[in-house]
Amino acid sequence: MDWTSYHDYDEINAWLDSLATDYPELASVEDVGLSYEGRTMKLLKLGKGGADKPIIFIDGGIHAREWIAPSTVTYIVNEFVSNSATYDDILSNVNFYVMPTINPDGYAYTFTDDRLWRKTRSETGSVLGCKGADPNRNWSFHWDEVGASDSPCSDIYAGPEPFSEVEMRNVRDQILEYAANIKVYLTFHSYSQLWMYPWGFTSDLPDDWQDLDTLATNAVDALTAVHGTRYEIGSSTNTIYAAAGGSDDWAKGEGGVKYAYTIELRDTGNYGFLLPENQIIPTGEETFEGVKVVANFVKDTYS
């Protein structure tokens, strides 16, 4: 797979499988459930230190139209895999559990029908035929309290109940299974160039917000050093808007992951969701440096 163009869901899954085949000492892939429309969801396990090592859990593509997110997640994986000798210290002491595209049906739909589709593709029972829920309003922690809609036709429809969307249940179950070892949760979105931490349901900050802010600042400093790309740092509510039911709030509030971040990638609105393909590699390059800071922090702190 290359990073000069965007790739569809099947291509990404095939690439994940190829990593397990080509780098068996480094990568393994597990099928962890099906999407609403029956697409296989895969979890990549990357590392060579054994199952007891601290984990960084990474996902992308929760919103279908945010194509740069899966591209960046796969770029990061490829960078570690292709240069595993260089990053031996990280890969021997930290495990990366990665799901690049956690809204498979929505993502597929953006390739075939509606480039700007955001939600899942589940049936809602809407008399208007509106489909899907916003998967990043569907998590159970303070679900539907703020910044979400009860209308199935809304782009921010929270769903009929928490975890109504099978894709989010699949991701949740993986986080819960490995929660004891997950030290960092990174979920990649676009756009706006933000590195955010909880909470999304309130303007109040977590008790340990300074720890989260410090790590985010160090990561963003490394990111910015690559191409000069500026990121804003802060809690979700205070940086963009209040929205409950997000995966990062859940990871921290229910999953017990101390360092939970939502990262909004390039750009700041010039192209928005339609980020040109010639920005995939530079976005990957700079984001990798930020993730590397996080990985070294986990290695030094927990391994």
UniProtKB/Swiss-Prot annotation:
It catalyses: Preferential release of a C-terminal lysine or arginine amino acid. Residues 5-298 form the Peptidase M14 domain. It comes from the Eukaryota. One of its GO terms (cellular component) is extracellular space. One of its GO terms (biological process) is proteolysis. Gene3D superfamilies: Zn peptidases. The keyword Metal-binding applies. Its EC number is 3.4.17.2. Belongs to the peptidase M14 family. This is Carboxypeptidase B. It comes from Astacus astacus (Noble crayfish).
